[in-house]
């Protein structure tokens, strides 16, 4: 089964690589239109997944990721149209030179070929990945989690219908329709056809892919994100940023999970924080030192554990730790962070510069919410993933991350001497 999918994807990728930007954009517009026209079918399938997920006791955080609403589907279709407006990187000449030999050399962007994506309870990934791959002339093989089986199948069917109506091969976007884990292992070994693999899910999935895949793997998306409030921070502004980072969408991988507070301001800042968090329904997981200032506050507070610092909450929970100085804050991030998104709230330019230099994460912020780590917010369009590694892409992966390059040499009957 996967062998046939791989062959079909490879053939489709060759055809996609020949398309003009106009042809690709026309197909994207058709996909967006059909997603809206067939929204009832997709939403009905999503409700089946939601019912099954609730029966199986899925957490509220994961249920939120799984849920599609008419508004969310409309927003997703809008994102597909936004991809049309993005510059097509395929064919771009990255650099070029005329060599002493007389050879005129260019380095030109080309599609990767076939991309494999394995993801869990995130039905929006199906459309985001398909649109970005199509724009960059790549075919894609999708393997969604069993939680999103009905939604994914309905969505891919609509996408394939739109592709065929646009004169493109349906095999450009394929989905593995069985939740069998053995098929995941088979996909990881499909290096004959698949050029890059992207897992989007928990630590277990990432570990499996790193250990079992014979295909280059881009890992990331696990976001234990930190914000450090230094002694010079403006309290009101800091509390606004913290609230946004934690509350706007707690199930997102760029949501704030651990707050680090300088000891010089803890006695005044933490009671104010407690009031803000109580209003938002956030439970605080406090260290022993932080508990002194939070135990009588408005927000619910419990003792933090070592494991809490290492895991994503993906919910209205937040760790709170007091640090003695900037160095301790940075050391905490190095110890427990996942190199995703980390921030400092400060009025000191010196402290901001030092933090930015010392924290080795894909995205580092000064006086801004970690929620900005997103392809759309970065102006990249819908993202295929957020990479926390350094090769071959880092941070939100937009269109450029789905390309490679080839060298092209022009000569006039030129021979090497």
Curated annotation (Swiss-Prot):
Please verify whether the record's keywords include Oxidoreductase: yes
Q: Which Gene3D superfamilies match?
A: Aldehyde Dehydrogenase, Chain A, domain 1 (3.40.605.10), Aldehyde Dehydrogenase, Chain A, domain 2 (3.40.309.10)
Q: Which Pfam families match?
A: Aldedh (PF00171)
Q: Which UniProt keywords apply?
A: Amino-acid biosynthesis, Cytoplasm, NADP, Oxidoreductase, Proline biosynthesis
Give any GO molecular function from the UniProt entry: glutamate-5-semialdehyde dehydrogenase activity
* Biological process annotations from GO: L-proline biosynthetic process
Q: Which CDD domains match?
A: ALDH_F18-19_ProA-GPR (cd07079)
Pathway, per Swiss-Prot/TrEMBL? Amino-acid biosynthesis; L-proline biosynthesis; L-glutamate 5-semialdehyde from L-glutamate: step 2/2
Q: Which reaction does it catalyse?
A: L-glutamate 5-semialdehyde + phosphate + NADP(+) = L-glutamyl 5-phosphate + NADPH + H(+)
Q: Does the keyword section mention rRNA processing?
A: no
Principal EC category: oxidoreductase
The UniProt entry, under InterPro entries, shows: Ald_DH/histidinol_DH, Ald_DH_C, Ald_DH_N, Aldehyde_DH_dom, G-glutamylP_reductase_CS, Glu-5-SA_DH, GPR_dom
Q: PROSITE patterns of this UniProt entry?
A: PROA
Report the EC code(s) recorded for this entry.
1.2.1.41
Q: Where in the cell is it found?
A: Cytoplasm
Q: Which GO terms describe its cellular component?
A: cytoplasm
- Please report which protein family the annotation says this sequence is part of: Belongs to the gamma-glutamyl phosphate reductase family.
Write out the function statement from the record.
Catalyzes the NADPH-dependent reduction of L-glutamate 5-phosphate into L-glutamate 5-semialdehyde and phosphate. The product spontaneously undergoes cyclization to form 1-pyrroline-5-carboxylate.
In Swiss-Prot or TrEMBL terms, this protein is called: Gamma-glutamyl phosphate reductase
Q: Which gene encodes it?
A: proA
């Amino acid at each position: 089964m996967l062998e046939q999918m791989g062959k079909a994807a490879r053939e489709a990728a060759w055809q996609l690589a020949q398309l003009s930007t106009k042809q690709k954009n026309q197909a994207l517009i058709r996909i967006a239109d059909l997603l809206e026209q067939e929204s009832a079918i997709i939403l009905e399938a999503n409700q089946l997944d939601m019912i099954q997920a609730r029966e199986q006791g899925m957490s509220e955080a994961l249920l939120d990721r799984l849920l599609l609403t008419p508004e969310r589907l409309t927003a997703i279709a809008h994102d597909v149209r936004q991809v049309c407006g993005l510059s097509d990187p395929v064919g771009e000449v990255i650099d070029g030179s005329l060599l002493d030999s007389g050879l005129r050399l260019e380095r030109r962007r080309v599609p990767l070929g076939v991309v494999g994506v394995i993801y869990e309870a995130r039905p929006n990934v199906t459309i985001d990945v398909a649109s970005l791959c199509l724009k960059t002339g790549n075919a894609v093989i999708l393997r969604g989690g069993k939680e999103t089986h009905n939604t994914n199948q309905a969505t891919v069917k609509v996408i394939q219908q739109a592709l065929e109506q646009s004169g493109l091969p349906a095999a450009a976007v394929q989905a593995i329709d069985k939740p069998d884990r053995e098929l995941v292992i088979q996909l990881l070994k499909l290096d004959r056809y698949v050029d890059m693999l992207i897992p989007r899910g928990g630590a277990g999935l990432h570990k499996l892919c790193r250990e079992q895949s014979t295909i280059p793997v881009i890992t990331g998306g696990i976001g234990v994100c930190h914000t450090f409030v230094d002694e010079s921070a403006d309290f009101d502004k800091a509390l606004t940023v913290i609230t946004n980072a934690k509350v706007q969408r707690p199930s997102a991988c760029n949501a704030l999970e651990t707050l680090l507070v300088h000891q010089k301001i803890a006695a005044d800042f933490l009671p104010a924080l407690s009031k803000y968090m109580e209003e938002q329904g956030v439970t605080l997981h406090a260290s022993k030192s932080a508990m002194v200032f939070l135990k009588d506050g408005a927000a619910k507070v419990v003792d933090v554990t070592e494991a809490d610092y290492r895991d994503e909450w993906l919910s209205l929970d937040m760790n709170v730790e007091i640090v003695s100085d900037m160095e301790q804050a940075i050391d905490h991030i190095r110890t427990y962070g996942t190199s995703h998104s980390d921030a400092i709230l400060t009025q000191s330019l010196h402290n901001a510069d030092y933090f930015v230099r010392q924290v080795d994460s894909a995205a580092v912020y000064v006086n801004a919410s970690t929620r900005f780590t997103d392809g759309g917010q970065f102006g990249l369009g819908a993202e295929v993933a957020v990479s926390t590694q350094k090769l071959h892409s880092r941070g939100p992966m937009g269109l450029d991350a789905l390309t490679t390059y080839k060298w092209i040499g022009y000569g006039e009957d030129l021979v090497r001497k």
